[in-house]
Amino acid sequence: MLHAMLLAGRTALVLGFLFTSLADAQDLGNSAARPTMPFQLVSGFLVVVKGQVGDLDGLKFILDTGTSYTMIDRKVADRLRLRRRPGKITNFDRDVPIDWAEIPNLRLGPFQTGAFRVLVAKLGEYSRFAENVDGIIGLDLLGRSKKFFIDYEKQTVSWELAEDRAGAPPSPTYFAIPFIVQGYPVRLILDTGFQGILLYKERLRQRLPNLRTEGEEIEVGMGRLQTTQVKLPGVCLFGPETVATVFLTDGPVTGDLPGVDGYLGIASLKAKRVEFDFAARVLRWQ
C-alpha cells in the first residue's frame, strides 16, 4: 500500500495525512520519462551518487533530506582554492564549525547550478558515515525539483523538474512529519542520511513525563553522537500502535530546531520506493 504525509516545509507544521490511490502507487514506479541516475546503497541506507564540482568530476555525494544545505569536504574546497568565511551548524545534539564558500558550479543528474553557495567542513567530523565521500547534497538542491524519487529496488534516483523554476517556492529547509508516542504527537525530520529513529529525550519527557519504555536501556555511540537505545511502546506512524526501537539523545545545545523532536530515518519506513512531491508538499512511499 502507498501512504502519504503532508510536507512541513520551513514552518515544520504538519496539517494532517493524505492517502493516495492505487493509480498513484503505479505512477510512483514509472520513471521512464524522468531524468534518472544510478546510486550506490552504502551501509544499507545511504544513497550515494556521483557528481561534479567545478572541474572535479567523479565526486561522491550522499543525498540527504535531513540536511538543509549542501556541503563539500574541506579537501575538495582546498583543491578548488575556494575563499571561505566561518560559521557553524547544528548536527543532532551539537554545533559543528564550518565555513561558507561559493563554488563555480555543481553538476548532479539534471542539475547545473552555476555559482552556488555551500558549506565546507571536514565531513568525517560531521558524520562517521561521510568519511569516504566528497560532499552531501541537501534540500537546497534536491528541493529545486518538482518531485524527487528514490527507487531502492532498482537503486536509481530520478527527478521531475519544475517547468518554471523562477516562479517556484523556495526549497524547504527540512521535512517534519507526524509521529505519535503514547498518545502524544511529536514532529520528526525525515532523514535519508540516518538509519533509525532518534528522539531528543528532554523534549520528549517535557511532553511525556511518565514516558514508558520496555526492557534494558543500552548506551550506543554513533561516532561522536552518544545515545541510549530503548524499546518504546505506543508508537504510531501509520496504522496500529507498535513497539519501536529508538535512540534517545540530548537536544541541540543552542535550542535550534524549535518544534522538532528528533529524526526519522527513511529506512524505518521499509520502503521500496519513495517520492518527495515538493510541488504538492506531500511525501509518498510504497
Q: PLM features: residue spans?
A:
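Bacterial N-terminal signal peptides
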Residues: 8-21
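N-terminal secretory signal peptides that target proteins for export/translocation
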Residues: 1-7
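Pepsin/retropepsin-fold aspartyl endopeptidases
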Residues: 23-286
